Amino acid sequence: MKGFLLFISILMMIGTIVVGKEGYAMDHEGCKFSCFIRPAGFCDGYCKTHLKASSGYCAWPACYCYGVPDHIKVWDYATNKCGK
């Protein structure tokens, strides 16, 4: 039983490492990429195409992406330069 739990734990860690980071997509000015007036499914396609993410959705009013490679920048409150 302990071996099984260890195996499951290792699989979860591998999944976390392989999946990548997550966050809001940014526009060219460093602001969150708006999905306010976009059609359904837009953010999933945008995240996959432009950020090489595994998926995305509209976390109203901005696109939120999952599985973003580490070298791709996503919006971060600490380094926010939007409107500055």
Swiss-Prot record:
GO terms for cellular component: extracellular region. Keywords: Amidation, Disulfide bond, Ion channel impairing toxin, Neurotoxin, Secreted, Signal, Toxin, Voltage-gated sodium channel impairing toxin. The modification Cysteine amide is found at C82. Disulfide bonds join C31-C82, C35-C58, C43-C63, C47-C65. InterPro entries: LCN-type_CS_alpha_beta_dom, Scorpion_toxin-like, Scorpion_toxin-like_sf, Scorpion_toxinL, Scorpion_toxinL/defensin. GO terms for biological process: defense response. GO terms for molecular function: sodium channel inhibitor activity; toxin activity. PROSITE patterns: LCN_CSAB. Expressed by the venom gland. Belongs to the long (4 C-C) scorpion toxin superfamily. Sodium channel inhibitor family. Beta subfamily. Has the structural arrangement of an alpha-helix connected to antiparallel beta-sheets by disulfide bonds (CS-alpha/beta). This is Alpha-mammal toxin Ts2.
